From Swiss-Prot:
The active site is at D65. CDD domains: UDG-F1-like. NCBIfam families: PRK05254.1-1, PRK05254.1-2, PRK05254.1-5, ung. InterPro entries: UDG_fam1 (IPR002043), Ura-DNA_Glyclase_AS (IPR018085), Uracil-DNA_glycosylase-like (IPR005122), Uracil-DNA_glycosylase-like_sf (IPR036895). Keywords: Cytoplasm, DNA damage, DNA repair, Hydrolase. It catalyses: Hydrolyzes single-stranded DNA or mismatched double-stranded DNA and polynucleotides, releasing free uracil. This is Uracil-DNA glycosylase. PANTHER family: URACIL-DNA GLYCOSYLASE (PTHR11264:SF0). Its EC number is 3.2.2.27.
Length: 227
């Protein structure tokens, strides 16, 4: 079995990692990293899976692809590297977080505290070329992340938080008899006022986890990234 991640995700995703299609993706990415500026750096591609093992995952917040500017992408959806200014979508997430559960905003965008509690911060596409949003869409990452979504859905008792049309296109992969879907507009400034603000995804998520008999997420982030 190939060990790309280093936890139980390697077993869950083994049929994908051992496929010819994944080998093609691997060859493509090797050339991309050699010839272009690709984000995140190679060592952070699987960060979301590394921080949140399959057995511990109880929430999925699904993004589209990584941030495509320097010093932003860190392998977790919506999260940015320590010391990086907050992207507009994340500012809006923090605003809703405060309005929903009273979590105090912080001046960093490093969401590891959530990942450590079982929140899989998953982008559907795990890499992106500099300045080219969706530049690696359709190159093969979707077979990996779709397989992860399906495996979690089959196991059940997962809350899927789906913001915007792209994320909601994954709904057919999810068994809604065994899981909970929380959906709304995307937190982007272009759409946040059309249904993201006031959607209360964080309290609704914890209510669903309580119904599953699982511990709620403490959404309050530490004031600094070392905490």
């Amino acid at each position: 079995m190939k060990h790309f991640i280093g936890n139980d995700w390697d077993h869950v995703l083994a049929p994908v990692f051992e496929s010819g299609e994944y080998h093609k993706l691997h060859v493509f990415l090797k050339k991309e990293y050699q010839t272009k500026q690709i984000y995140p750096d190679m060592y952070h591609i699987f960060t979301a899976f590394k921080l949140t093992p399959f057995k511990d995952t109880k929430v999925v917040i699904l993004g589209q692809d990584p941030y495509h500017n320097p010093s932003q992408a860190n392998g977790m959806s919506f999260s940015v590297m320590p010391g990086t200014p907050l992207p507009p979508s994340l500012r809006n997430i923090y605003k809703e977080l405060y309005d929903d559960v009273g979590a105090q905003p912080v001046n960093h965008g490093y969401l590891k505290r959530w990942a450590d509690q079982g929140v899989l911060l998953l982008n559907a596409v795990l890499t992106v070329p500099y300045g080219q949003a969706n530049g690696h869409q359709g190159k093969g990452w979707e077979m990996v992340t779709d397989a992860a979504i399906k495996a979690l859905s089959e196991r059940g008792q997962v809350v899927f938080i789906l913001w915007g049309r792209f994320a909601q296109n994954k709904i057919p992969l999810i068994d809604q008899d065994k899981n909970v879907i929380i959906k709304s507009a995307h937190p982007s400034p272009f759409s946040a006022n059309r249904g993201f603000f006031g959607s209360r995804p964080f309290s609704r998520c914890n209510a669903a986890l309580k119904e599953f008999g699982r511990a709620p997420v403490d959404w309050q982030l530490p004031p600094n990234t070392e905490a």
